[in-house]
Amino acid sequence: MSATEGKVITCKAAVAWEAKKPLVIEDIEVAPPKAHEVRIKITATGVCHTDAFTLSGADPEGLFPVVLGHEGAGIVESVGEGVTNFKAGDHVIALYIPQCNECKFCKSGKTNLCQKIRLTQGAGVMPEGTSRLSCKGQQLFHFMGTSTFAEYTVVADISLTKINEKAPLEKVCLLGCGISTGYGAALNTAKVEAGSTCAVWGLGAVGLAVGLGCKKAGAGKIYGIDINPDKFELAKKFGFTDFVNPKDVADKGSIQNYLIDLTDGGFDYTFECIGNVNTMRSALEATHKGWGTSVVIGVAGAGQEISTRPFQLVVGRVWKGSAFGGWRSVSDVPKLVEDYLKKDLLVDEFITHELPLSQINEAFDLMHKGESIRSIIKY
């Protein structure tokens, strides 16, 4: 039994009091876990574009005040009543997509989108309807069921997975979102085949991870499409073979027509990792007539819609979406950790900056400027 079990813990957290404002480092109170909940001492968390998306005010589910963060790893501090899969001291990764193995979605075998706690998670509270986080007497909302921008957090016991204690938490925390998302989009969603041609729009962490997945599948050519050419040399480490800067070919008509001419008909697989509805269309229309598949990974702003001419689909192109790379979170993340430990999966190479919690706003600035792939906040 830990000295803090059953007690309220006061700790540091980065609080988003309102949209479009910098995070504020505050002392918050983290209540003990209730039934089927786990309290975790977070040791490291990544800073992801999804956190910035919600902070920007563009997220239709964005709630404030909130503790953001969803790419975290740590050590179990205590567990609530009925928790059997975890105990104090376990090394864990928080999961924004849970896995209950009981709901219609989990039982279908067709998706990783467990819906057991979807409604309460979207409402920023724990499954029983309240928050475990507060500051200055005010309730704070949870974020994506994880809230890892805090030294301690509470999650549902289906939103957590136990991992090998040999894995460095300050590295494998990234398997809680970005790397897994891109890597799995290539392997699980698109099911890229050996010798195929692929293109990735957006060479951030997710896009680079798509490249890794395409390389793992044996793709023959992997194109990176980005308006920041500074990313191209680094992307070669992740399997990319060719690069196109849309700004350089703007005088040649649409980017999709340029790419179709360049590749003798288009790509077998394309991936949109930006969240821009215009590039989503470009990615689809740059796939090969008859069999091309385009995977949407990036999240667009509230109210935005995608469009294309129906004939693009009639002639055999396929538009697909991918969340968390199609991985079944509780079952598959520990396997990805093992792949990392066996040096079969790059993780360290995504980390460009390590910062303390006090500098978390700097991590957002680096991301917005395109000067980082992933910044890690270490507690």
From Swiss-Prot:
Role of this protein: Class-III ADH is remarkably ineffective in oxidizing ethanol, but it readily catalyzes the oxidation of long-chain primary alcohols and the oxidation of S-(hydroxymethyl) glutathione.
Annotated EC: 1.1.1.1, 1.1.1.-, 1.1.1.73, 1.1.1.284
Gene behind this protein: Fdh
Catalytic activity: a primary alcohol + NAD(+) = an aldehyde + NADH + H(+); a secondary alcohol + NAD(+) = a ketone + NADH + H(+); S-(hydroxymethyl)glutathione + NADP(+) = S-formylglutathione + NADPH + H(+); S-(hydroxymethyl)glutathione + NAD(+) = S-formylglutathione + NADH + H(+)
InterPro entries (UniProt xref): ADH-like_C, ADH-like_N, ADH_3, ADH_Zn_CS, GroES-like_sf, NAD(P)-bd_dom_sf
Binding site for Zn(2+) 2: C100, C103, C106, C114
Entry's family note: Belongs to the zinc-containing alcohol dehydrogenase family. Class-III subfamily.
Transmembrane parts of this sequence: none
Gene Ontology, cellular component aspect: cytosol
Gene3D superfamilies documented for this protein: Medium-chain alcohol dehydrogenases, catalytic domain, NAD(P)-binding Rossmann-like Domain
Organism, scientific name: Drosophila melanogaster
Protein name: Alcohol dehydrogenase class-3
Keyword NAD: yes
Record's keyword annotation contains Phosphoprotein: no
UniProt superkingdom: Eukaryota
An example Gene Ontology biological process: formaldehyde catabolic process
One example GO MF annotation: S-nitrosoglutathione reductase (NADH) activity
